[in-house]
Amino acid sequence: MTESKAYRFGAVLLLIHLIFLVPGTEAASFQRNQLLQKEPDLRLENVQKFPSPEMIRALEYIEKLRQQAHREESSPDYNPYQGISVPLQLKENGEESHLAESSRDVLSEDEWMRIILEALRQAENEPPSALKENKPYALNLEKNFPVDTPDDYETQQWPERKLKHMRFPLMYEENSRENPFKRTNEIVEEQYTPQSLATLESVFQELGKLTGPSNQKRERVDEEQKLYTDDEDDVYKTNNIAYEDVVGGEDWSPMEEKIETQTQEEVRDSKENTEKNEQINEEMKRSGHLGLPDEGNRKESKDQLSEDASKVITYLRRLVNAVGSGRSQSGQNGDRAARLLERPLDSQSIYQLIEISRNLQIPPEDLIEMLKAGEKPNGLVEPEQDLELAVDLDDIPEADIDRPDMFQSKTLSKGGYPKAPGRGMMEALPDGLSVEDILNVLGMENVANQKSPYFPNQYSRDKALLRLPYGPGKSRANQIPKVAWIPDVESRQAPYDNLNDKDQELGEYLARMLVKYPELMNTNQLKRVPSPGSSEDDLQEEEQLEQAIKEHLGQGSSQEMEKLAKVSKRIPAGSLKNEDTPNRQYLDEDMLLKVLEYLNQEQAEQGREHLAKRAMENM
């Protein structure tokens, strides 16, 4: 009877338990079905509400922390592939159940909140790639958790008062899937719900997608573009090589590109030309050709002017020698010299003899002796070949001009006298300037007619009549005195190292001449003083004086008249009568200015060519 009563009592308890459970499950399922019928979109929301493996790990971590706090060793076993937990061991031990309930109640709500927040922070800090790698399985929510099944942890809400009275085995509570979620829901129900946790998880996933894959996509696009351009370049190169092999090296490009390249090259060339012209102009301005000349350019111009003048002078010497050698001077010259010597020598004739001796580089006493003797010195004469006059001054070799003494040759003749300089050439002279004018400027207009009878054949005057200079004791026999017919401008511009020696020689020579011929004391002060210009009145007076002398000496020979006319040109009127009056200018100053102007034009042209060459070399 007792057993039957106990059995009945247990059955009654089971019935009561079933009575309380069945209406709750029916009500929950009925409410769920109504919601699903009204709002079909809730199915998708419910799919998202299922817990993810990350959430399960977080809860497991929370449970481990709780167990470590109470120093309890337990190994909860969750089967993620099953929606219903299966108890591994069933132990009915009331004491252990009471311990579990007491351990659950010991933790306060604040401690549970702190544990959950720490778990969420750790889940946020973990990268999504690590989480994906740690997944041991692929969760298929539709298969594992069907929508129609009401066996979810949200739907099965166990009332607390029932849980207190009911006793479940310990292992069942720890290994069940519902209990941890129920505990968390009971603790965090007011602040965090599974929906909020699911939204947070989705937000974290979206943030990970926005940060990571965007940069990867950009890098992929850049790499694809690079590969595409490299492929195009390779194709273009292969086509270009094939086209060059067929055509022969020409560029395989369209006409528009060729036209553009041509225009760019033209613009570039024009810019380069303009820059070169500007540089040339700047250099010319700096050098003083367009602006104020500096000292270096002045020295260069003087040097070039002296070279040009030396070329002209050497050419004129050769011209005079060639003209004089072609004429025969026989008995008439001897008679004229005898008549001159028979007459009493006045100051003008002596001055003329000194000038002739200077022009011919013969001492005056030797010249007088030759005129008196009337014989030809055979031992001092060398035959010379016919002279060939040059056509242009530039053909004169520079080796004979660049010497300090521009009239002294490198090699000497057999008699010890310098040979004639190199062959010269003569350009077209400017208007109003002729060979006779130049000879007049140089004081050699009548040298050909004054040739003595000692040189009837074709002999060079420089080689035949160049005698040893007159000096004390013949100590300086090999030196040649300064040429008298060098222009004053040339003598001023050409600096010579041995100028003092030549001045000393000239002083000794003049002193000996004054001792030997005291009549020259009055005419020694007649010096040639060049001035920048001559007035028309002076020219007219000199022309009248020359005409009067010619009329007075009309009975004499023509050569004597020319000699006296030359002397009258050299000696101004009134200079012998009154020494205090200023010296007159010479008629040959205008000719000299013309010659210098002509040389300056050549100098300017040569300077321009020189500057252009230097500019081209610098570029």
Curated annotation (Swiss-Prot):
PTM sites of type Sulfotyrosine: Y153
Region (Disordered): 247-307
Presence of the UniProt keyword Transport in the record: no
Listed Basic and acidic residues bias regions: 255-286, 295-307
Record has Calcium as a keyword: yes
Origin superkingdom: Eukaryota
GO biological process per UniProt: angiogenesis; eosinophil chemotaxis; induction of positive chemotaxis; intracellular signal transduction; MAPK cascade; negative regulation of endothelial cell apoptotic process; negative regulation of extrinsic apoptotic signaling pathway; positive chemotaxis
Residues carrying Phosphoserine: S176, S270, S434, S534, S557, S558
One GO location term (cellular component): extracellular space
InterPro entries, A to Z: Chromogranin_CS, Granin, ScgII
Residue ranges crossing the lipid bilayer per the database entry: none
Keywords from the UniProt entry: Calcium, Cleavage on pair of basic residues, Phosphoprotein, Secreted, Signal, Sulfation
Binding partners and assembly: Interacts with Secretogranin III/SCG3.
Annotated family: Belongs to the chromogranin/secretogranin protein family.
Other noteworthy facts: Binds calcium with a low-affinity.
PANTHER family: SECRETOGRANIN II, SECRETOGRANIN-2
Record's function text: Neuroendocrine protein of the granin family that regulates the biogenesis of secretory granules.
Name this protein carries in UniProt: Secretogranin-2
